[in-house]
Amino acid sequence: MGLSWTVPLEWGKNHSTTNPLGFFPDHQLDPAFRANTRNPDWDHNPNKDHWTEANKVGVGAFGPGFTPPHGGLLGWSPQAQGMLKTLPADPPPASTNRQSGRQPTPITPPLRDTHPQAMQWNSTTFHQALQDPRVRGLYFPAGGSSSGTVNPVPTTVSLISSIFSRTGDPAPNMEGITSGFLGPLLVLQAGFFLLTKILTIPQSLDSWWTSLNFLGGAPVCLGQNSQSPTSNHSPTSCPPICPGYRWMCLRRFIIFLFILLLCLIFLLVLLGYQGMLPVCPLIPGSSTTITGPCRTCTTLAQGTSMFPSCCCSKPSDGNCTCIPIPSSWAFGKFLWEWASARFSWLSLLVPFVQWFAGLSPTVWLSVIWMMWYWGPSLYNILSPFIPLLPIFFCLWVYI
């Protein structure tokens, strides 16, 4: 049974759609070649539609090997046409246009073409330029010395080495310069640290002083009244409008005087240890001592090479007697004699001191135990004076 059918004329009127029938891939309905007539000149049409997708083999609604490009007889839906297997399109050919991508780095032209002025400099012209004082100042500063003439050399390497090989002042020792700056900086930092700690001594002692008036309670300023009402604050930080401000200043002034007295005592002890104070102890067998500047001793004392000796004058043929004694003991005796001359009641304490010095070891152990028991409290009291210890140590070593 054969199938015969003709193409309706209405299909040929659709000039905007190429190949409307779907099975003439190499022909096009063109009005110029009688496309709307019954006998179109298909073969003589030069504008053929080369539809490569129509020649591809696929599975569609019309069976294997034929895929209508504009829908099958059952419609446009995928269900009507069956399973469509989309084949990927061929990738475009690789472009041979090098202008579209990164351009290769061009070959560097020779130096004679890019910098012709550089080719004018050779060893002779360079040495001639070095004779100019302005140019020589760049290579030979005023601090160094060099020869008056520069001998030409054949190679550039030896030329540069001859320019920078100076015979003059040596290079500065950077290690010595660094250590010279580092020492004062460390001393300045340590001094600033000690100063900040020393400035806290008056406030700490002021807090301890005021705490004696508030045993078992928090210190509160008692200078508040109705005339100058202030908020609750510590007596060690009274504002100027508080009546307790003047008492706070008085306490700190007394504390500063106490610190200065302590430093003065330490200085006197240090001078006495160095043998710079004309203090002489009582010579055994004599009741009087002549104080004055030490004179040259005719007889050297035993064991006085490391420690100073006190030289006391005696009217014995104009010679002086040197006695090796602890300088601290001499200084203590000097202070005791000075205080006893002005305060006669201190002489009453001499028997007590002698008795205390002759106590048994049991009493000394008891004293040590009490110091151990009261040690933490004593540390809290003496802790503000700890920053003074490095200063005292430095003075003791370097004076």
UniProtKB/Swiss-Prot annotation:
Regions of this protein lying in the Intravirion compartment: 2-252, 202-252, 369-374
Subcellular location, principal: virion
Glycosylation sites: 319
Subcellular location: Virion membrane
PTM field: Isoform M is N-terminally acetylated by host at a ratio of 90%, and N-glycosylated by host at the pre-S2 region. Myristoylated.
Annotated spans, Pre-S1: 2-118
Pfam families the record matches: vMSA
Membrane-traversing stretches: 181-201, 253-273, 348-368, 375-397
GO terms, biological process: caveolin-mediated endocytosis of virus by host cell; fusion of virus membrane with host endosome membrane; virion attachment to host cell
InterPro entries with a match to the protein in the record: HBV_HBSAG
Record's description of how this protein is used: Systematic vaccination of individuals at risk of exposure to the virus has been the main method of controlling the morbidity and mortality associated with hepatitis B. The first hepatitis B vaccine was manufactured by the purification and inactivation of HBsAg obtained from the plasma of chronic hepatitis B virus carriers. The vaccine is now produced by recombinant DNA techniques and expression of the S isoform in yeast cells. The pre-S region do not seem to induce strong enough antigenic response.
Domain of life: Viruses
Spans annotated as Disordered: 84-109
Function: The large envelope protein exists in two topological conformations, one which is termed 'external' or Le-HBsAg and the other 'internal' or Li-HBsAg. In its external conformation the protein attaches the virus to cell receptors and thereby initiating infection. This interaction determines the species specificity and liver tropism. This attachment induces virion internalization predominantly through caveolin-mediated endocytosis. The large envelope protein also assures fusion between virion membrane and endosomal membrane. The middle envelope protein plays an important role in the budding of the virion. It is involved in the induction of budding in a nucleocapsid independent way. In this process the majority of envelope proteins bud to form subviral lipoprotein particles of 22 nm of diameter that do not contain a nucleocapsid.
Family membership noted in the UniProt record: Belongs to the orthohepadnavirus major surface antigen family.
The protein, known as: Large envelope protein
